Amino acid sequence: MSSFQQGVSGLNAASKNLEVIGNNVANSNTVGFKQSRAEFGDMYAAALNRAGTSNVGIGVSVQAVTQQFNQGNITATSNPLDLAINGNGFFEVKSGAQTVYTRNGQFQTDKDGFISNNQGMKLIGYPIDANGLIQPGAAAPLQLPTGGVAPKVTGSNTIEMNFDARQAITLPAGSPQVDFANAKSYNDATSVTVYDAKGQDVALTYYFQKTSTDNWNVYATANGTSVNVDGAGKPLPVTTMTFQANGGKPTVPLAPVLINIPSTVNAAGATTLAIPGVALDVTRSTQFGSSFGVTSMAQDGYAAGQLAGVSIEKSGVVMATYSNGQSKPAGQVELATFRDPQGLSPQGANLWARTVASGDPVVGVPGSGNLGVLQSGALEESNTDLTGELVNMITAQRIYQANAQTIKTQDQVLQTLVNLR
């Protein structure tokens, strides 16, 4: 009679296996989904004082349905807030007092600027303090800045260039003055945009006039107005440069030179504020027998800017990019791992909750310890092996049919016994 029990248990097990496989197939296109596997064990009736070799099993039972947390394929998207974890870890998301975990990195910003998933749950990470520094350990929902960035007045201007040692001395006869309208009164020129305290742009132009074999005068204008003049209003150099005889770096000046930029009217017709004490650094320049050229030009000021975009680095640092070209950290994504991920409780919607079996989460930044790294503008696909699952489905179907045949055969045997006379 145990054949009936064996067959029924086989039908139940095969049915459960088909349910698991069907769920895997149904979620083969679900972002961050982890496929499950039904695990079975045989069953025996309890029999005391009986040799083990004479026991006959009474069927099969489902021991567990376990999730397989192997890595899914990563595909690129056009949303910079889409995140894929390459390696171990879960995103931590929160709604009210409920904290759950997910591998689904489909994020966007809500009306308040919080990074959240499509259920409105906020992504947890490390925010920035008042000084713009990331606060490790102070986990909280990540929020993008909603305002702009204030302007910064230019405080330094570093220029690295080469002066052509072959050029002729251009100092006009009888006068050391330069005429900005006369290109023959200077050898070379270069320009840079600097900013006043209001973020208004100022066109700062430098003119270089060779006065002897290794000496150059450096003049400057702001929006066409000389920044240094004598009592008669005629231009004066802001500094002079003296080079070594071998053409190496200058011996004068050896340190940045402070220049004061007066209030002027810029190209937009706006009256700009004076910019005092701009440190002009030309100490890395050279004078060789090659054409004049600017190798690098840098200044540290900028105009006001509005939030223009966001990017997330592989370490989880969220960078806010502004319309003035500036970028600032807005926080850092936190990841969590568990001693036993199999112990996590599936909550649906690609979410898991911690349990006693899983242990408490161990949190950290991406790339630290055994945590994976993030890929921005990408998503982790379902790890369902669709081809393999379709094969498993056919196998489970055949097993179901075979167990049904076991019951049918046993019924025929019993019918034969009943018909005996």
Which residues does each PLM region occupy?
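Alpha-helical heptad-repeat coiled-coil segments that mediate oligomerization/polymerization in large
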Residues: 7, 11-14, 29-40, 326, ...
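Small/polar low-complexity and glycine-rich loop motifs
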Residues: 34-385, 390-392, 399
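Acidic/polar, glycine-anchored loop/turn motif associated with catalytic or activation segments
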Residues: 403
